[in-house]
From Swiss-Prot:
Gene designation per UniProt: hflD
Membrane as UniProt keyword: yes
Signal peptide: none
Main location: cytoplasm
Name of this protein: High frequency lysogenization protein HflD homolog
Listed GO CC annotations: cytoplasm; plasma membrane
HAMAP family in UniProt: HflD_protein
Length: 207
């Protein structure tokens, strides 16, 4: 995969989209079905030649691009701190995951099991697929620690379907974090290349 600014921004946008959808489900008990489908689909896409291909096209990540642009434009109090906390947490967990090959294998096997469910039901967002992906997250990423504490309405958080959707979205966020790292992303790049990342984000939003 090319370590290009475009690939890095698309991966970051996917990460922000996953975090934004987690917020939607946690606070409102629902999220945009097309945006959710895009994130779930990325977990089964391994043949694409670039990051955009993994998500179908960049337009499917518009929500994430908008959230990313907002975070890059604002500093301090202007930022969505809840969203930032999810993104930082996912980036941290991805780094821990990459140091544990047996855990990576567990994630891979879990996704393969969910993929069989997807093929059987011919629907990547079927509740059985969602349950399998959520269980994969719970059995692997959740064990790495520290767990990501999701804020929201208790009535929505205690609903088993919503809890599964949130875990699936967090797993898709880990996938995006892996892509960010593969495209040359790092903490230092986030800190010192904000202007370049923002320019590319705005360019993608303008298309």
């Amino acid at each position: 995969m090319d370590a290009s600014q475009r690939n890095r921004v698309i991966a970051l946008a996917a990460l922000f989209q996953a975090a934004s959808l987690v917020k939607d489900v946690a606070w409102h008990g629902r999220c945009d079905p097309d945006e959710f489908r895009t994130m779930v689909g990325s977990l089964f896409s391994f043949e694409a030649s670039d990051v955009e291909g993994i998500y179908g096209n960049v337009h499917r990540l518009r929500r994430g691009l908008q959230a990313l642009a907002s975070q890059l434009e604002n500093r301090g109090s202007g930022n969505d701190m809840e969203l930032t906390r999810y993104v930082i947490g996912l980036l941290f967990l991805e780094r821990k995951l990459m140091k544990q090959p047996h855990m990576i294998q567990g994630v891979r096997e879990g996704i393969q099991g969910a993929e069989r469910q997807r093929d059987y039901f011919d629907d990547p967002t079927h509740e059985s697929v969602n349950a399998a992906l959520a269980q994969t997250y719970q059995d692997t990423i959740s064990q790495l620690g520290p767990r990501i504490i999701v804020q929201g309405e208790q009535a929505h958080l205690s609903n088993s379907d919503n809890a599964a959707r949130i875990r699936t979205l967090l797993l898709s966020g880990i996938r995006a974090a892996v892509l960010w790292r593969q495209a040359g992303g790092s903490r230092w790049r986030l800190l010192f290349s904000r202007a370049g990342l923002l320019r590319e984000t705005r360019a993608l939003l303008a298309h």
